[in-house]
């Protein structure tokens, strides 16, 4: 699913920047509240890395939130670009404890369901219908080696 692909993408970003794992940690965060980073983008693949691990983490989160909101595909109407892909009402929870990380992505489903998903990410925010019955979530756990440690 799209949510699974996005969660895997964030885990890959965290693995490529293990020195800043705590900078990726977010709890019940809504991508719509994100402010775009200032200045030139950081890139882990640049020949001359011009940003710190923390700056790269902030930029990774900003890029990832744009993907969650659907900015990879846009429709332009009356000169205004609007995302046409992405998850409906996404919430994000990223936990880092030592080298163990969990990435949870929640979104609003099309209809109510009897049994809620096991993930509590996004629950209780009033975004997923009455009693969170339209709450959907995917949660991935992984281990990220520390800086200089090969997996």
Residue map of PLM features:
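Flexible, low-complexity segments enriched in proline/glycine/serine and punctuated by aromatic residues
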Residues: 2-151
